[in-house]
């Protein structure tokens, strides 16, 4: 499976189950953000394009910081 696609699908399923209330799915948001961070940590120097499921690095780092996940 494509990098972080599992986490993105889990988040989407949770949001749909909860009538699009993301507040009930924070664990899945965090899982996706942490997966994306791991991807950047592993691939940032390779020149690979980030997975379409992940934000760009700077916004990702801001989101991680605001959630105290750094």
Swiss-Prot record:
Boundaries of every CHCH domain copy: 1-43
GO cellular component terms listed in the entry, alphabetical order: mitochondrial intermembrane space
SUPFAM superfamilies with a match to the protein in the record: Cysteine alpha-hairpin motif (SSF47072)
Keywords: Disulfide bond, Mitochondrion, Repeat
Coarse class of the protein's main subcellular location: mitochondrion
Disulfide bonds: 4-35, 14-25
Keyword Repeat: yes
Description of what induces expression: Differentially expressed during meiosis.
Superkingdom of origin organism: Eukaryota
Record carries keyword Ribonucleoprotein: no
Alphabetized PROSITE patterns for the sequence: CHCH
Subcellular location(s) per record: Mitochondrion intermembrane space
Motif (Cx9C motif 2): 25-35
Motif (Cx9C motif 1): 4-14
InterPro entries assigned to the protein according to its UniProt record, in alphabetical order: CMC4 (IPR027179), Cys_alpha_HP_mot_SF (IPR009069)
PANTHER family named among the record's database cross-references: CX9C MOTIF-CONTAINING PROTEIN 4
Record family assignment: Belongs to the CMC4 family.
Domain observations: The twin Cx9C motifs are involved in the recognition by the mitochondrial mia40-erv1 disulfide relay system and the subsequent transfer of disulfide bonds by dithiol/disulfide exchange reactions to the newly imported protein.
Protein name from the UniProt record: Cx9C motif-containing protein 4, mitochondrial
């Amino acid at each position: 499976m494509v990098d972080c696609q599992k986490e993105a699908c889990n988040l989407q399923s949770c949001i749909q189950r909860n009538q699009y209330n993301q507040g009930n799915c924070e664990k899945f948001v965090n899982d996706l953000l942490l997966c994306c961070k791991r991807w950047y940590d592993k691939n940032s120097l390779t020149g690979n394009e980030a997975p379409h499921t992940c934000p760009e690095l700077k916004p990702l780092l801001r989101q991680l910081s605001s959630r105290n996940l750094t």
